[in-house]
Structure formats: structure tokens, C-alpha cells
From Swiss-Prot:
Function: Cell-counting factor that limits the minimum size of the multicellular structure. May up-regulate the expression of both gp24 and gp80, which mediate cell adhesion.
Full protein name: Countin-2
Region (Disordered) location: 231-254
Phylogenetic placement of the source organism: Eukaryota, Amoebozoa, Evosea, Eumycetozoa, Dictyostelia
Predominant location category: secreted
The organism of origin for this protein: Dictyostelium discoideum (Social amoeba)
Length: 254
């Protein structure tokens, strides 16, 4: 009887270790889908789908082929094709990677953005503004995002960024984004008050399959100077009292 219980315990621990290793691929999967979704859809729609190798070998380089083969081998070619054939118009990288079983999901997750601040509160063109955010996870997040949206004084131009958070346990966390004013001919960067929205989501914020828990707002002021554009970059600080992983990869969404 004792041997039976020990065997069950070993199998249970092994399953947890396997899940942790598999979920460690989540950021890699999300990056891969963000970068190679278009190529994959073209390959799959072309009907060359006899095996993982047949599909993945048609991607442009060895790194992309390796990531594709790894993800495809986990679920098998039939399930891999099924996921991509069911995407429709909502190509949500987090949802795709959850369907490929490398990103965890939790329908009972819950989290709250607590506070946000911008430093400095105002500055001339050329200033880098740091947007800080503190958030609390009440119930474990599967795969989600902390996202920011900055809207210029005209209300017509937005800059978006998000940081991926994976298997985040209950606790308090903080992270930050940078809004850097850099010269560009593509878009005007007018002086005035910029509105900042920060949100936390299960899934990709704004996507069909996601849940946005809450949002908080802040602002900063750009004073007169040369016309430039804003760039959003994520910092992967992700400090907190709980546990989980945070990716500093920035996905420009708007």
C-alpha cells in the first residue's frame, strides 16, 4: 500500500514538473505567433500539411522552423492544423498558444491594477516618460497581459504596449513602461496633455477571448518643442511578492 502511494506521489510531482517545463515555452510561443503568423497561415492554406516537418520547413529561417516544430510536436500535426484553421479573424497569439497547450489558462483568475504614476509629470520634446504600474493578483492568472494605451492631446493617435505575464500567483507586483520621444517624419507629436490607460487582463487585452479585469488612468504633459513621435517600450522588471513570470517583450498594438 505504501509503495502505491509513493508511486502516485511521484507521478503527480512528475506531471507538475512537466507542466512547468511546458509552460516555460509560453513566451517563446507568443513571440513566434506574433512574428510568423502570416507565413504560417499561407503555408497551411497551401495544403502542404502532411507532417510538422513539412509545414515548418517552409518557414524562412532555422530559428522559426525550430520553434514551429517544437510547438507542433507537442500537440501533433492534426491538432496544430485544427488550431490555425479555427482562428478566423481574431489572430490572438495568447489564445493560440493556450490552444497549443504551452500557455496556461485559468477561467477563475482575478487581478486588479492598484496604482499608476508617470515620471516626470511633464517635460519638453525629447523627454522619456516612465509609466509605472502596481497590480495585485487575487487568483492565479493563467496567461495575461499588463497593457498600456497612451493617447495624444488630439485624441486621434494612440500608442500601445503590453507585457506578457504567465502563471502568475497571488501577490502584489509592479512593472513599468517607457514612452520615449524620438524624431520621426511619420507622425506628429503635439504638445499638450497625454492620457494614459493601464489595464490587466487574462489573455491578450482587447482580444475576443480575453477578460479585462480593470483599468486605471493617469496623464503627463509634453511641452512645446520639435515635432517627434512617441515609442512605447516595455521594461521587464516584474517585481512582486508572489511568483510567476513576466516578459518584457513589447507588442505594439495600435
Amino acid at each position: 500500500m505504501m509503495i502505491k502511494y509513493i508511486t502516485i506521489a511521484i507521478l503527480f510531482i512528475a506531471s507538475l514538473v512537466k507542466a512547468d517545463l511546458q509552460f516555460s515555452l509560453c513566451p517563446t510561443c507568443v513571440d513566434f505567433i506574433n512574428n510568423d503568423m502570416g507565413d504560417l497561415e499561407k503555408i497551411i492554406s497551401g495544403g502542404i500539411a502532411t507532417s510538422c516537418g513539412a509545414v515548418c520547413s517552409l518557414l524562412p529561417n532555422n530559428i522559426e522552423q525550430g520553434a514551429c516544430n517544437l510547438l507542433c510536436d507537442i500537440v501533433g500535426i492534426d491538432e496544430f492544423l485544427k488550431v490555425f484553421n479555427n482562428i478566423g479573424e481574431d489572430a490572438d497569439p495568447v489564445w493560440i498558444c493556450e490552444e497549443l497547450t504551452v500557455c496556461p489558462k485559468n477561467q477563475n483568475s482575478n487581478a486588479t491594477v492598484l496604482t499608476s504614476d508617470v515620471s516626470p509629470a511633464s517635460g519638453p520634446h525629447g523627454t522619456t516618460f516612465t509609466i509605472g504600474v502596481a497590480y495585485k493578483v487575487e487568483s492565479t492568472l493563467g496567461t495575461g497581459e499588463v497593457a498600456v494605451m497612451v493617447t495624444d492631446p488630439t485624441g486621434s493617435n494612440g500608442f500601445g504596449d503590453a507585457q506578457l505575464i504567465v502563471n502568475t500567483q497571488p501577490g502584489q507586483y509592479s512593472t513599468s513602461f517607457s514612452f520615449a520621444a524620438t524624431p520621426s517624419e511619420d507622425e506628429q507629436f503635439p504638445a499638450g496633455v497625454y492620457q494614459v490607460q493601464l489595464m490587466i487582463c487574462e489573455g491578450s487585452c482587447g482580444a475576443k477571448h480575453s477578460v479585462t479585469f480593470n483599468s486605471v488612468y493617469a496623464n503627463f504633459t509634453v511641452t512645446s518643442g520639435p515635432s517627434v513621435t512617441g515609442q512605447m517600450t516595455g521594461t521587464g522588471s516584474g517585481s512582486g511578492s508572489g511568483s510567476g513570470s513576466s516578459s518584457g517583450a513589447a507588442y505594439l498594438r495600435y
